A protein has these predicted regions:
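C-terminal helical cap/extension that packs against the catalytic core
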Residues: 1, 41-101
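Residue-level recognition of the N-termini of beta-strands and the immediately preceding loop/turn
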Residues: 27-28, 100-102
């Protein structure tokens, strides 16, 4: 699993460049959430460059773009799941099925919303 905030267009473009350089032949499943005050279309466009599949969710209710709305911005196949923990489970399952790298990106709030921060503290 790779975790990167990639919470704005510039950071998303940088992540996409790094993914294409370092993991150019590695299939990827993306778990993504974007805040309403960010340019979600540009973030999705950049992240679509390396993602074979996207699972879209909401990391911060009230501030986050709805998952369904975000999923429509991706050029790659994308599914929507409003509940971030369910979205994480879906993304993990897809990554395992596709033997793909799971990339968590698009919001600085997403790791905490899916419980990764707690897993790291408990490890």
């Amino acid at each position: 699993m790779l975790i990167d905030g990639a919470h704005n267009p510039q950071a998303a473009k940088q992540l996409a460049e790094n993914m294409q350089t370092i993991f150019q032949n590695v299939p990827c499943v993306l778990l993504c959430a974007v805040m309403r005050d960010k340019n979600a279309a540009e973030v999705a466009h950049a992240l679509s460059g390396f993602a074979g599949q996207a699972v879209c969710t909401v990391a911060e209710p009230g501030r986050g773009l709805p998952a369904e709305e975000l999923s429509k911005l991706f050029a790659c196949p994308a599914v929507a799941e409003e509940d971030p923990k369910k979205a994480y489970e879906t993304a993990k399952k897809l990554a395992k099925e596709k033997e793909a790298l799971l990339v968590v990106a698009g919001s600085l709030y997403l790791p905490e919303a899916i419980g990764i921060e707690k897993e790291a503290k408990d490890a």
